[in-house]
Regions:
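Signature for HUH/AEP ssDNA processing cores
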Residues: 77-202, 206
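Helical (often loop-to-helix) elements that flank the catalytic cores of nucleotide-handling enzymes
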Residues: 217-266
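Short cysteine/histidine-rich metal-coordination sites, predominantly Zn2+-binding motifs
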Residues: 68-79
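Short helix/loop capping segments that flank catalytic or ligand/cofactor-binding pockets
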Residues: 61-65, 99-104, 225-228, 320-321
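Acidic/histidine-rich catalytic neighborhood
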Residues: 212-217, 254-298
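Generic recognition of stable, solvent-exposed alpha-helical segments in well-folded globular domains
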Residues: 48-51, 165-169, 173, 238, ...
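Long, low-complexity, charged/polar intrinsically disordered accessory regions
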Residues: 1-61, 70, 274-368
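Histidine-centered divalent-metal-coordination microenvironment in nucleic-acid enzymes
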Residues: 53, 91, 192-227, 312
Length: 368
């Protein structure tokens, strides 16, 4: 290292690396200036994935924190400080259970617990394939078995893939359902529903069982007014607690009907899981509990805009690489050679099988 630092050209290299924030994959831009002289400029790759570029992903996470915090607490980036007084709810939407998986659990006292206590599941029961439905092991969070099915034959891989693929559409329908429910609630109380609008920011987090769930910050705003864009004197017609109740009801009622690809005529309904968490934010940062389990969102205790911003920024740099999957397209033939868990391999195999059935939108690159 000392030899390299004292070598010729090191200072020039250092200045170039420093100019792009020590990006792992800087991009060289070649062009001409206004006098038609050749010029070379280096710029960041701007990849948000931490495993590809730690520097750019860190910058992306910091930018995300700034944007979320500005929207939640105000006071910078053109957002008025009064935005913190508007009803805001931190929402977590999980996926349904498609089969029992190994888990790293903690009790109410914070101590680690056994994976699946036989007392909790009704004794030493086995699945139809003879696999035990209990697990007395205390798993660590980084352990390879965490997230793996207790019985891969029982696990509903088709449902897993369909939920993942149709999650964007399910979210879109949720936002429509929420706006309609809010419109109905405000109209019933004598408030003009056209005077408010709902703002969202969401990120996707991949659970250890390799299925996505959603974290979102939802805020109630006044409709834009050209004469007073900040509308600092606006008073919300409803509270954060009431907004949280409307959000939870919308999330529990929205569904998406699909033709089951495993049968000729059956219909499969895609919906969010039962673990839906809504946590209102208040200007005083004191949490208003709505009955949902706080641990579902990963944020316990006092909830503020700063904490929500930090939590969302933490996950925007994650990617499929955490499961051992490259961001590049895969061929069906390559699935068997991937260095991934059997659970992930089964998911990819299911995607391939559904693609062969001609399921809309799901495709794999054909082998060469």
């Amino acid at each position: 290292m000392v030899r390299r630092a004292s070598s010729m050209g090191f200072e020039s290299w250092w200045r170039r690396a420093e100019s792009v924030g020590f990006c792992a994959h800087p991009i060289q831009l070649v062009g001409a200036d206004e006098y038609r002289r050749d010029r070379v400029v280096w710029t960041r790759c701007n990849n948000r994935r931490a495993h590809i570029c730690p520097s750019c992903s860190d910058l992306y996470a910091r930018d995300t924190w700034q944007l979320v915090h500005a929207g939640a607490a105000g006071g910078h980036h053109g957002m008025p400080i009064t935005v913190a007084d508007r009803p805001q709810v931190f929402l977590t939407l999980t996926a349904p259970s498609y089969g029992a998986v190994h888990a790293a659990t903690r009790g109410g006292d914070g101590k680690r617990g056994v994976c699946r206590d036989h007392h909790r599941i009704g004794g030493y029961r086995r699945c139809p394939h003879g696999k035990p439905l209990w697990c007395s092991t205390v798993h660590d969070h980084g352990e390879g078995r965490v997230g793996q099915p207790l019985c891969s034959e029982c696990y509903d891989y088709v449902g897993h893939v369909l939920f993942t693929w149709h999650l964007p559409e399910l979210w879109r329908r949720f936002t429509i359902t929420l706006r309609r429910a809010l419109h109905k609630e405000l109209k019933a109380t004598g408030v003009d529903p056209d005077g408010v609008r709902v703002s969202f920011i969401k990120i996707i987090e991949l659970q250890v069982r390799a299925i996505p769930h959603i974290h979102a910050l939802i805020r109630l705003d006044p409709h834009e007014n050209g004469d007073d864009p900040d509308q600092t004197d606006w008073e919300s017609p409803t509270s954060a607690t009431k907004l949280a109740a409307i959000i939870e009801h919308a999330a529990r009622t929205v569904t998406l009907a699909l033709t089951d690809p495993t049968t000729d005529s059956a219909v499969r309904r895609i919906r969010f899981g039962t673990q839906i968490d809504t946590q209102p934010l208040t200007a005083s940062s004191a949490p208003e509990k709505t009955g949902s389990a706080e641990q579902n969102s990963g944020i316990a205790g006092s909830l503020s805009g700063r904490r929500v911003a930090r939590y969302l920024a933490k996950y925007v740099t994650k990617s499929l690489a955490d499961l051992g999957i490259s961001a590049r397209r895969l061929s069906t033939e390559a699935i068997g050679d991937l260095d991934v868990s059997e659970h992930v391999r089964a998911i990819l195999t299911t995607i391939s099988a559904l693609a062969d059935k001609g399921l809309s939108g799901i495709k794999l690159r054909p082998g060469k």
